[in-house]
A protein has these predicted regions:
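Residues on a specific face of well-ordered alpha-helices
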Residues: 7-9, 51, 55, 59, ...
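Glycine-rich phosphate/diphosphate-binding loops and the adjacent beta-loop-alpha structural elements
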Residues: 63-116, 127-130
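Glycine-rich phosphate/pyrophosphate-binding beta-alpha loops
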Residues: 4, 109-141
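A general structural signal for well-ordered alpha-helical packing
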Residues: 81, 100, 104-107, 122, ...
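Short glycine/threonine-rich catalytic loop with a Thr-x-Gly-x-Asp
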Residues: 49-53, 73, 77, 114, ...
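A glycine/threonine-rich phosphate-anchoring loop and its flanking beta-alpha core
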Residues: 1-72, 163-167, 171
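Gly/Pro-rich interdomain helix-loop hinge
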Residues: 135-202
Length: 203
């Protein structure tokens, strides 16, 4: 795939009919076999790589805070982010076999994570921007991404998770090599800027 969707390891499919998204889920949709071929990614347009790559990062992050997450999904998501956080920008600025391979693996791991935990609000709110305004999926997911995470962090006391959400955020901060939610938000904004994923809807 485009090193972003993780579709090769998920039980989900999406069809748009008259601009309306229809989702399907079945174990029968998981392929029996798949191939990760990073050579195909190197020459892809940067706009596609930027959007798809951010989608992989978003999937892993959303998986970590999902109410449906478990130990296995956390392991997949953490491994994904350890790779993608360090490879995403270089994959866009100077694509080569090494960083293309890393993003392929990161995407695959993120797909495995969300197949267990599913995604959360950033994905749920992205679909109208794609169907109505033709904003690519990963770009649409990123539009308000850090705002959703800040809201969750600022409302830890209202968490309905079966796990300690504060500890999950501590894990996220560690994976992004930041100290707090402000630094995390700044790093996400910086990554989007470097990837030329515009936040301004007017543009």
């Amino acid at each position: 795939t485009t090193a972003g969707s993780g579709a090769e390891v998920t039980s989900n499919a999406v069809i748009y009919v008259d601009g309306i998204k229809h989702s399907f889920e079945s174990e029968l949709l998981i392929p029996d076999n798949f191939f990760l071929i990073p050579e195909f990614l190197i020459s892809a347009p940067n706009k596609i790589k930027a959007s798809a790559g951010f989608d992989a990062i978003a999937q892993a992050l959303e998986s970590l805070v999902s109410k449906k997450s478990n130990d296995q999904s956390v392991e997949f998501a953490s491994k994904s982010l350890r790779v993608s956080v360090n490879s995403y920008i270089s994959f866009l600025k100077d694509p080569n076999l090494k960083n293309a391979t890393e993003m392929s693996i990161a995407s695959n791991l993120a797909g495995k994570a969300i197949n267990i935990s599913k995604t959360t609000a950033p994905h749920a709110t992205s679909y109208p921007f794609t169907s109505l305004f033709n904003i690519s999926h990963g770009h649409a997911v990123g539009l308000f991404f850090e705002s959703f995470f800040r809201f969750n962090f600022d409302n830890l006391n209202r968490s309905e998770t079966s796990f300690d959400l504060k500890k999950r955020f501590d894990l996220i901060f560690d994976l992004f090599d930041v100290r707090n939610i402000d630094d995390f938000s700044s790093k996400i904004k910086f990554m989007k800027k470097q990837a030329e994923l515009e936040d301004n809807l007017i543009k």
